[in-house]
Design a protein with these regions (language model features):
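Membrane-integral, polyisoprenol-dependent glycosyltransferases
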Residues: 1-185
Length: 185
C-alpha cells in the first residue's frame, strides 16, 4: 500500500517537469503505433532501447490515451509490482521477517520511487530483476522445471526492457555460483 501510494499520488504533477526522455518515448510510441501498426518487438527503438520495453511502457495507452501521466502510470505499476516481487523473493530466501523489511525498504527507497514516477522504461527492471531471481530461487528450492523456465523468460524480459537489464544475466549467473558454493544440494 505504501509503495503504491508513493508511486501514484499526484502522478500527473510530481515530478513537476517532464524528464527529457518521457516526451521522446511518447513520440516513439505515437510514430510506431500510428494507424494500428504493430512494430517488430525484437528490434531497437528510440535511443537503442528495445522496442518491447518501449511498448510495455505504453501498456495503458490504448485505454487512457497517449499522455505523460499514462506513461508514468505504467512505470508506477512496475515499481509497485517490484516491491511485491521483492517481498516474495525475500520470503523465498528466508522468512516473512526478512521479507517485510526488504519490501518496506524497497517501497520507501527514493531512487526506486523516482524511477517509478517517470514515464520511461527504467522501472521495468525494478520488477523483472527480482522476478527473475525469485523464480530461479523457487526453482532451486522446489526443483520444478517450470520455475526455471519462467526465470529464463523474466531474465529475457530484463534484457529487452531497458539497457541496464542486460546486467541481469551476469547477476543471475553470479547468484547461481554463490548458491552452488554456499548451498549445494
Amino acid at each position: 500500500m505504501i509503495a503504491a501510494l508513493a508511486r501514484t499520488l499526484w502522478l500527473d504533477s510530481l515530478p513537476r517537469a517532464y524528464f527529457g526522455d518521457e516526451p521522446r518515448v511518447a513520440a516513439f510510441l505515437y510514430r510506431e503505433y500510428r494507424g494500428g501498426r504493430i512494430p517488430n518487438f525484437f528490434t531497437m527503438g528510440w535511443n537503442t532501447w528495445p522496442v518491447v520495453g518501449l511498448s510495455l511502457q505504453g501498456i495503458f495507452v490504448p485505454w487512457l490515451g497517449l499522455h505523460m501521466t499514462t506513461l508514468r502510470l505504467s512505470a508506477a505499476l512496475f515499481g509497485t509490482l517490484g516491491v511485491l516481487v521483492t517481498y516474495l523473493l525475500a520470503r523465498e530466501l528466508g522468512s516473512w521477517r526478512l521479507a517485510l523489511p526488504a519490501a518496506f525498504l524497497f517501497a520507501v527507497c527514493r531512487t526506486a520511487i523516482d524511477f517509478s514516477r517517470l514515464g520511461i522504461a527504467h522501472s521495468q527492471i525494478l520488477f523483472f530483476e527480482p522476478l527473475a531471481l525469485y523464480l530461479w530461487w523457487r526453482g532451486v528450492n522446489g526443483g520444478r522445471a517450470l520455475s526455471y523456465l519462467w526465470a529464463g523468460i523474466a531474465t529475457g524480459w530484463c534484457m529487452y526492457s531497458y539497457n541496464a537489464g542486460q546486467l541481469v544475466p551476469p547477476l543471475l549467473f553470479a547468484w547461481m555460483g554463490l548458491a552452488a558454493v554456499f548451498a549445494p544440494r
